[in-house]
Structure formats: structure tokens, C-alpha cells
């Protein structure tokens, strides 16, 4: 197994594990996943993949995977049918920062977000949410159309 060093973010010092981009590409190109949840590792060194959801999982499964009291980054592959009856897909980047999460975690995720987001080439929309009401399936539907 080859180890690829992650590059650190100049503003926060947080790197991005190679598995993050690889897993994103699996979602984007192969449709292997419905969603991917990312977290900053316990040593605050890099962003890593925490969980993936299979292509058969629902939006509710995705929402259940987001912690109630801790920050995360997430990617969700939203499938929909247009008015012209064409099957489409849009990829959403979610910056999840619950209001009850620790201040330090909020700051760490906020300062690392742009660097991490740039690693994921092909994201269509970005959503910042602090509670489930700000991340609703109808919001995704509105943005995608």
C-alpha cells in the first residue's frame, strides 16, 4: 500500500488525506456512493473519510449520519428528473456545523473548509447548515432545478 502525504492548509495547518479525493471520485464518476461524510481526524492533522453511504441509501440515511453535536463536511449526490423527463445528478458540498458543537471545532472546520472544498473538483452547490431545518431535501431540489 502506498502512502501519500497530505498537503497542509496554510491557514489552519489541516491536510487532506488522499482517500478523500479518491472516495469523492468514486461518488462522482462511478456512482458508488450516495454520500460521503468527512471529518478532521482526532489529531487535527488532516481531513479523512468517516463514512460512505451506498448508492441505494436515502437522504434520511444521509441526515442520520450527520452528528447532532459535532462538525463535519459532507458530499451528497442528489438525483432528480427534469421537467423534460431527463435523469440528472447534482453534487452538493455540505459544511455541517451544529450550533451546539464546540467553538474550537467550528473554528477549525471553518478555516479548513475552502482548502478542502477546492480538492473536490466537480461540486455543483455548497450548503452551510447548523441544524436539520437548514438542510432539507426540498432545498436541494430547489437548488438543483
UniProtKB/Swiss-Prot annotation:
The keyword Calcium does not apply. SMART domains: ADF. It comes from the Eukaryota. Residues 11-145 form the ADF-H domain. One of its GO terms (biological process) is actin filament depolymerization. Pfam families: Cofilin_ADF (PF00241). Keywords: Actin-binding. GO terms for cellular component: actin cytoskeleton; cytoplasm. Gene3D superfamilies: Severin. GO terms for molecular function: actin filament binding. InterPro entries: ADF-H (IPR002108), ADF-H/Gelsolin-like_dom_sf (IPR029006), ADF/Cofilin (IPR017904). Actin-depolymerizing protein. Severs actin filaments (F-actin) and binds to actin monomers. Belongs to the actin-binding proteins ADF family. This is Actin-depolymerizing factor 11.
Amino acid at each position: 500500500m502506498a502512502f501519500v502525504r497530505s498537503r497542509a492548509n496554510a491557514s489552519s495547518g489541516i491536510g487532506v488525506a488522499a482517500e478523500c479525493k479518491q472516495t469523492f471520485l468514486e461518488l462522482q464518476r462511478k456512482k458508488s456512493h450516495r454520500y460521503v461524510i468527512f471529518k478532521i481526524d482526532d489529531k487535527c492533522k488532516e481531513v479523512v473519510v468517516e463514512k460512505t453511504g451506498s448508492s441505494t441509501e436515502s437522504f434520511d440515511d444521509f441526515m442520520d449520519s450527520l452528528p447532532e453535536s459535532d462538525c463535519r463536511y459532507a458530499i451528497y449526490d442528489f438525483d432528480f428528473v427534469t421537467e423534460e423527463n431527463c435523469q440528472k445528478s447534482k453534487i452538493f458540498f455540505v459544511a455541517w456545523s451544529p450550533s451546539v458543537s464546540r467553538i474550537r471545532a467550528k473554528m477549525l472546520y471553518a478555516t479548513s473548509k475552502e482548502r478542502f472544498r477546492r480538492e473536490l473538483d466537480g461540486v455543483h452547490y455548497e450548503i452551510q447548515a447548523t441544524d436539520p431545518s437548514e438542510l432539507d431535501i426540498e432545498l436541494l431540489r430547489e437548488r438543483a432545478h
